[in-house]
Amino acid sequence: MSRRNAAVKRPVLPDPQFNSRLASMMISRLMKHGKKSTAQRILSDAFSLISERTGGNAVELFETAVKNATPLVEVRARRVGGATYQVPMEVRQERGTAMALRWLVTFSRARNGKSMSQKLAGELMDAANETGSSVKKREDTHKMAEANKAFAHYRY
């Protein structure tokens, strides 16, 4: 590990189109090979699809979807005397949001659909309705933490 000072965390600026920090973070997660304009187009197309289907505000639905997919606890491997325990730990809000966005993108890519914007719109709507793969992943993470509650005293 580096002996230098920890790097200063740069603030995430809100996306100019949607005026949302979460949207800006999502664009960064969607981006492949530095193609930011493509990622922005995918997100804006997904938001317009959501607005058409629901008739509501797509940005609010997106924020609800991220909130529903955000885990509160996770398990982390901890080695104690030759045995590895899955130790449940609380997730900081920043990390939880990052995990939720990562899961939303991963499960959107895994969906069957025509375009990425359609797949993303479907996953976001499912997550907002507390269904969908990303919310299931959060529930599985919480179940794992609950099952390993006995090892909570190994927290670091």
From Swiss-Prot:
GO biological process: translation
CDD domains named in the record: uS7_Bacteria
Xref: Pfam families: Ribosomal_S7 (PF00177)
Domain of life of the native organism: Bacteria
Intrachain S-S bonds: none
GO MF annotation: an example: rRNA binding
GO cellular component, one term: small ribosomal subunit
Swiss-Prot/TrEMBL keywords: Ribonucleoprotein, Ribosomal protein, RNA-binding, rRNA-binding, tRNA-binding
Record InterPro entries: Ribosomal_uS7 (IPR000235), Ribosomal_uS7_bac/org-type (IPR005717), Ribosomal_uS7_CS (IPR020606), Ribosomal_uS7_dom (IPR023798), Ribosomal_uS7_dom_sf (IPR036823)
Family: Belongs to the universal ribosomal protein uS7 family.
HAMAP family xrefs: Ribosomal_uS7_B
Subunit composition and interactions: Part of the 30S ribosomal subunit. Contacts proteins S9 and S11.
Its job: One of the primary rRNA binding proteins, it binds directly to 16S rRNA where it nucleates assembly of the head domain of the 30S subunit. Is located at the subunit interface close to the decoding center, probably blocks exit of the E-site tRNA.
Protein name from the UniProt record: Small ribosomal subunit protein uS7
Organism field: Prochlorococcus marinus (strain AS9601)
Lineage per the UniProt record: Bacteria, Bacillati, Cyanobacteriota, Cyanophyceae, Synechococcales
Chain's gene name: rpsG
